[in-house]
Design a protein with these regions (language model features):
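Short gly/ser-rich anion-binding loops that grip negatively charged ligand groups
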Residues: 40, 53, 71, 96, ...
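Single, function-defining residue in the core of a domain
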Residues: 1-23, 96-99, 110-114, 154-367
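Short, contiguous clusters of charged residues that form electrostatic/catalytic patches at enzyme active sites
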Residues: 34, 133-136, 212-219
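A residue-level signal for conserved active-site and pocket-lining positions in enzyme catalytic cores
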Residues: 50, 138, 342
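Active-site-proximal, Lys/Arg-enriched surface segment
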Residues: 36, 67-173, 308, 313
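Gly/serine-rich nucleotide phosphate-binding loop at the start of the catalytic core
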Residues: 1-70, 74-76
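Hydrophobic, Leu/Ile/Phe/Ala-enriched alpha-helical segments that form helix-helix packing faces
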Residues: 39-40, 54, 89, 218-225
Length: 367
């Protein structure tokens, strides 16, 4: 059953007053309140449905015009929202050392392809490629206080540069494979030539990777003066470039570590069950090859949030990242099944401290 929006919800009327001066007239302000009300009370939160349920709107395109054309600044509204949230939670937030910025990404799936920048993005949870907008997001967490900060829209390189179009222009006989590895090979073969085309080169310069977007979100949080010291992130954000940005801003970080990442062999020593050093060949060892070498006796039971984990931790060096501490964690004493690998720049933290911090990242799943 659809609920008609006759007037703004009471909580919206009360809180929206903070934003009143950001809108040029009463109509813009009313659209703002109606849109927020629709997001709260309607199950279907699409713009079309909110417009349909707003009874006092003579023209159902008014709300669309308000969001896309009206002369108000989304950035000013965003900044005011964050300032207001921080001011309202001063007594509830913890110290900066116990506060976090969480980086994540999300797929906003769509049925049709009429939306601007909608594209097929990889969904790692079910190995599919749905039509969606792919957002890189930032969230603030400090004790009981948690709320989203901002987002950046990720656009695939091929979509930004109109890559297929330029391949056909310069290599009309070239077939473009669907498989990722084969497609990557075509990129290596053709992109240097495509970049000689001034139009393609201009589009290439406009592309922003997820790392670029994550850096932007971190910088925005620092410019806003958010009180925090630690960044929590997923494995695909862990790069030399992002780590260097965090080092410059003197921020700590904890991340998942992909199992195919290399460890520098000379940076650690692993011993067998008898305490004898295990000789390792080569200069690098993948995490997935390192884990089977760890004796069961080296794992320690660690309790976090009333859940037991069996953890091994040591300091290693990762190419491009430097010296870090890693934690290999199983959820059972038999060390069977899947495991997680965490990594942090804080080599002085214990396995419990690292686990406890990273597990806070899951709080955003309920936002």
């Amino acid at each position: 059953m659809q609920l008609p929006i006759v007037t703004a919800a009471p909580i919206v009327k009360e809180r929206a007053k903070v934003f009143r001066d950001l809108f040029g007239d009463e109509r813009q302000y009313r659209h703002f309140q109606n849109y927020l009300t629709g997001l709260i009370v309607l199950e279907n939160k699409s713009l079309a449905n909110i417009s349909r349920c707003t009874l006092k709107s003579a023209d159902k395109t008014n709300l669309s015009w308000f969001l896309s054309e009206a002369p108000w600044s989304p950035r000013e509204v965003q900044n005011r929202r964050i300032e207001y949230m921080m001011a309202q939670t001063t007594s509830l937030r913890q110290a900066a050392t116990a506060s976090y910025l969480i980086l994540d990404d999300a797929l906003c799936e769509h049925v049709g392809s009429l939306f601007e920048y909608v594209d097929r993005h990889y969904n790692h949870s079910d190995d599919s490629f749905p039509l969606a907008h792919n957002l890189v997001t930032s969230h603030y967490l400090s004790g009981a206080v948690r709320f989203p900060i901002d987002f950046e829209l990720y656009r695939r390189y091929e979509e930004v540069t109109r890559w297929s179009e330029f391949v056909f222009k310069h290599f009309p006989q070239q077939e473009i494979p669907r498989q990722a590895k084969a497609r990557a090979k075509v990129h290596r073969q053709l992109d240097a030539t495509l970049l000689k085309d001034p139009e393609f080169a201009t589009l290439d310069g406009q592309f922003r990777s997820k790392i670029d977007l994550a850096k932007s979100l971190i910088e925005q949080s620092i410019e806003r003066g958010l009180s925090l010291t630690t960044i929590l992130m997923d494995s695909w954000y862990l790069s030399a470039e992002l780590v260097e940005t965090l080092r410059q801003y003197q921020k700590d970080w904890v991340s998942l570590l992909k199992r195919n990442r290399n460890l520098e062999v000379h940076s650690f020593q692993i011993k067998d069950a008898q305490g004898q050093p295990i000789a390792l060949e080569g200069s690098h060892l993948k995490v997935e090859d390192f884990v089977p070498l760890i004796p069961q006796e080296s794992y320690r039971k660690t309790r976090v949030n009333e859940q037991d984990y069996w953890c091994f931790t040591c300091c290693v060096r990762i190419p491009g990242i430097g010296k870090v501490r890693i934690v290999i964690s199983f959820d059972n004493s038999q060390l069977s099944g899947t495991y997680a690998v965490l990594v942090t720049n804080r080599t002085d933290w214990s396995a419990k401290e690292i686990l406890d911090r990273y597990l806070k990242r899951w709080s955003i799943e309920t936002l």
